[in-house]
Swiss-Prot record:
The UniProt record lists the keyword Mitochondrion: no
Subcellular localization, as worded in the UniProt entry: Cell membrane
Protein name (Swiss-Prot/TrEMBL): Membrane progestin receptor beta
A GO molecular function held by the record: steroid binding
Gene name linked to the record: PAQR8
Primary localization class, coarse: membrane
InterPro entries attached to this UniProt entry: AdipoR/HlyIII-related (IPR004254)
Family per similarity comment: Belongs to the ADIPOR family.
Pfam annotation, one family: HlyIII
Cytoplasmic face of the membrane: 1-75, 133-174, 235-243, 305-319
GO biological process, one term: oogenesis
């Protein structure tokens, strides 16, 4: 018996040694990549306030930037937070489909499908922007414009499910006529404001750039969250027992926390150079926004399952299809805006190089 135990302990020890060597094995298996560089070795466009090091050098092959997913640099946490969140959304939705037997062809399901699509879209576009933007100046602008398109798509996807699944009757009777058109416009305005701010202002960025980003996005959030906020407030005033309402509450709280870290460069402002790889504000923003999305998804799945009678009483299939068609119209408008400003950037960079 003692011999068997010692053999097992020996096996565990060997396994532990292999696990400790796993990061080194993975690193050795990847192509040899350039190391990161300090801020003085990259153009001004790529520098972030109070982030002194951990930048990837520009001008390398695309392969390098894709494989930098496994390299230690100042964007890698931003990439992984949204990559893991996208996988979590997919897995949670798939588990719901397997459990509930989702009727794919039903009009009742369409807003939910578009919401999940919009969530995956914004998370994917965001991680691609942070992963690939260091390739060149044009790539930097291009991928961040794509990121902003993803944000507008997610905003409207959220508006759809809040409107169809989460709103209570008192709010619905007052705002149903103009809510979705206004949400679509605010989604496009948010994309336009972010793209224009990126195009118009250069580092070091003035305060006006943040205003162009935050104000349209803030208006979109206030509008999109209004059906949820109204329902949550009434629920808590009456001694809330709804599980979905608690998830919606968490969604709001996590979003507000993420918005703070997006707007303010903390904690790196107080510890310049100490938060280069892990711990700077944009990473915290990504983490809380990911948790916000997962809380929102959980709330919407509960609403989808538990409020079907309310949904079917309010909405005809035709009105649902019309509302969901506007989703693709918003995608087209936001994409066209981003493409137009990208062409302007491309012309400006060409003139600069000539």
């Amino acid at each position: 018996m003692t011999t068997a135990i010692l053999q097992r302990l020996s096996t565990l020890s060997v396994s532990g040694q292999h696990l400790r060597r796993l990061p080194k094995i993975l690193e050795d298996g990847l192509p040899k990549m350039p190391g990161t560089v300090p801020e003085t070795d990259v153009p001004q466009l790529f520098r972030e306030p109070y982030i002194r090091a951990g930048y990837r050098p520009i001008g390398h092959e695309w392969r390098y930037y894709f494989f930098s997913l496994f390299q230690k640099h100042n964007e890698v946490v931003n990439v992984w937070t949204h990559l893991l969140a996208a996988l979590a959304v997919l897995l949670r939705f798939w588990a719901f489909v397997e459990t509930e037997g989702l009727p794919w062809t039903s009009a009742h399901t369409l807003p939910l499908l578009l919401y999940v699509l919009s969530s995956i879209t914004y998370l994917t576009f965001s991680l691609l922007a942070h992963l690939l933007q260091s390739k060149s100046e044009l790539s930097h602008y291009t991928f961040y414009f794509v990121d902003y398109v993803g944000v507008s798509v997610y905003q409207y996807g959220s508006a759809l499910v809040h409107f169809f699944y989460a709103s209570d009757q008192a709010w619905y009777e007052r705002f149903w006529l103009f809510f979705l058109p206004a949400a679509a416009f605010c989604g496009w305005l948010s994309c336009t404001g972010c793209c224009y701010a990126k195009y118009r202002y250069r580092r070091p960025y003035p305060v006006m750039r943040k205003v162009c980003q935050v104000v349209p996005a803030g208006l979109a959030f206030i509008l999109d969250i209004s059906p949820v906020a109204h329902r949550v407030a009434l629920c808590h005033l009456s001694g809330c027992q709804e599980q979905a309402a608690w998830y919606h509450t968490l969604q709001i709280v996590f979003f507000l926390v993420s918005a703070y870290f997006f707007s303010c460069p903390v904690p790196e402002k107080y510890f310049p150079g100490s938060c280069d790889i892990v711990g700077h504000g944009h990473q915290i923003f990504h983490a809380f926004l990911s948790i916000c999305t997962l809380s929102q998804l959980e709330a919407i799945l509960l609403d989808y399952k538990g409020r079907q009678e309310i949904f079917l009483h309010r909405h005809s299939p035709l009105s649902i299809y019309a509302a969901c068609l506007s989703f693709f119209f918003l995608v087209a408008c936001s994409g066209a805006t981003a493409a137009l400003l990208r062409e302007k950037i491309k012309a400006r960079l060409s003139k600069k190089d000539s």
